[in-house]
Design a protein with these regions (language model features):
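Acidic, metal-coordinating catalytic segment for phosphate/diphosphate chemistry
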Residues: 1-22, 94
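Residue-level preference for beta-strand/loop junctions
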Residues: 17, 42, 96-100
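Conserved hydrophobic "DFG−1" position in protein kinase catalytic cores
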Residues: 25-26, 34, 106, 125
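Conserved Nudix-box catalytic region and its N-terminal flanking loop in Nudix hydrolases
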Residues: 27-68
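A short coil-to-beta-strand element that immediately follows conserved catalytic motifs
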Residues: 72-82
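Active-site-adjacent beta-strand/loop module that shapes the phosphate/pyrophosphate-binding cleft
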Residues: 82-112
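NUDIX/MutT-family hydrolases
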Residues: 103-107, 114-145
Length: 154
């Protein structure tokens, strides 16, 4: 069992706080990589995920990006840390948690993009000014901050 699964065996479905990381990966055309997730069905979000024991937020970001996309990322730049009442998440099994999401930006990536896990339906390079309607609300906030703070390509 992983850390979160082991924790859940002890506390059940109670709300908890979990740290995680996400990454805005920007290509040479200024588009960003978005992930269409299986749950909530079809929702678009930034690639990323939850921290494992002993990881830094950067290590979490690098691991999650590779696991989900097959891409290796480097030169991560901190965008911000996002948390609060609006960051309540839930899983299909009823588990709930508040995420503390550390968001990074990079244009340093290599590898072949592919759906590598059981969480994803697809990946697309998307114009950050034209997000899909079903983009996660919390990730819209992160992408909005990205658009406000990044005036030129990384």
């Amino acid at each position: 069992l992983g850390y979160i699964e082991e924790l859940r065996t002890l506390i059940g479905h109670k709300r908890i706080i979990l740290p995680g990381s996400s990454v805005i990966i920007q290509n040479k055309d200024g588009f960003i990589l978005m992930q269409q997730r299986k749950y909530p069905h079809g929702r678009w979000s930034l690639p990323g995920g939850l921290m494992e024991l002993g990881e830094s937020t950067v290590e979490t970001a690098i691991r999650e990006i590779f696991e989900e996309t097959g891409l290796t990322v480097g030169n991560l730049k901190l965008l911000g840390v996002y948390s609060g009442e609006g960051y309540l998440c839930s899983a299909a099994n009823g588990d709930e948690w508040y995420v503390v999401n550390t968001a990074y930006i990079t244009s340093d990536y290599k590898g072949t993009l592919c759906v590598n896990d059981d969480e994803s339906i697809a990946f697309e390079w998307i114009d950050p000014n034209k997000l899909p309607n079903d983009t996660a609300k919390t990730h819209r906030i992160i992408i909005g901050d990205y658009l406000c703070t990044v005036k030129e390509k990384i």
